[in-house]
Curated annotation (Swiss-Prot):
Pfam families: ThiG (PF05690)
Species: Nitrobacter hamburgensis (strain DSM 10229 / NCIMB 13809 / X14)
Similarity comment: Belongs to the ThiG family.
Name this protein carries in UniProt: Thiazole synthase
Gene3D superfamilies: Aldolase class I
The protein's Enzyme Commission number: 2.8.1.10
Binding of 1-deoxy-D-xylulose 5-phosphate, residues: G157, A184, G185, N206, T207
Length: 260
């Protein structure tokens, strides 16, 4: 089972709610993914008016856990304020914390992120921080009280998949008791499977499903990929080798194949 703070879930695929061709397709895709947790932007919900009400109605029909985020925030103050508004609106202490340093790369402001996380945790929030794959940053987030860390695979929406595999592997090795979620940069089901094969507890994605030619079918594909990757990790993957190693035993080889 996947554990986030004091709650357990069976699905290891978290999915976003933006960019879909229609609300109905979004709803069908989330169902196909089997996701139990969806991320929602506070800015979309508060700016939507009646459209926001209809969107929220669709989310309630799915019977999923909502993880609001602070997407678009560029300062500690803005992120903390947005998180507090999200707690009031959605009735949850969970927050996906994003503090963005640059609009072009959407790279996290890791200094502001740690500061904001510390403030929110003291205020009773359960923080899900979006960060880079830097081990030092992840350790600081854990030190201030984060039980979940969400490093990117690649920049948001880039669809590049895992760019720094060694760094993500190191995070998993050094933070064995922390729930780790690969967040951002996933473009194909194979990328999600690779993340789970590394031992990551879950994958969070949005654009790869929402912008697919068939979002519903793609959501199903990601669900299968995450399950396959996790099963492979638990089964124990063989280590890569630099040289060939015969898979067929030589014992019992017919004598005429023997080399004199």
């Amino acid at each position: 089972m996947l554990k986030f703070y004091d709650r357990e879930f069976s699905s290891r695929l978290l999915i976003g709610t933006a960019l879909y061709p229609s609300p109905k397709i979004m709803q069908d895709a989330i169902r196909a993914a089997g996701s139990q947790i969806v991320t929602v932007s506070l800015r979309r919900e508060t700016a939507g008016g009646r459209t926001g009400d209809a969107f929220w109605s669709l989310i309630r029909e799915l019977d999923v856990t909502v993880l609001p985020n602070t997407a678009g925030c560029k300062s500690v103050r803005e992120a903390v304020t947005t998180a507090k508004l999200a707690r009031e609106l959605f009735g949850t202490s969970w927050i996906k914390l994003e503090v963005i340093a640059d609009n072009d790369t959407l790279q996290p402001d890791v200094i502001g992120l740690v500061e904001a996380a510390a403030v929110l945790i003291k205020d009773g929030f359960k923080v899900f921080p979006y960060c880079t794959e830097d081990l030092g940053v992840a350790m600081r987030l854990v030190e201030v009280g984060c039980k979940v860390v969400m490093p990117w695979a690649a920049p948001i929406g880039s669809a590049k998949g895992i760019v720094n595999r060694d760094a993500l592997r190191l995070l998993r090795e050094r933070l064995p008791d922390i729930t780790l979620v690969v967040d951002a940069g996933i473009g194909a089901p194979s990328h999600a499977a690779q993340a789970c094969e590394l031992g990551y507890d879950a994958v969070l994605l949005n654009t790869a499903v929402a912008k697919a030619a068939d979002p519903v079918a793609m959501a199903g594909a990601f669900s299968l990929a995450v399950e396959a990757g996790r099963t492979a990790f638990e089964a124990g993957l063989m280590e890569a080798r630099d040289f060939a190693s015969p898979s067929t035993p030589v014992v019992g080889t017919p004598f005429w194949h023997a080399v004199s």
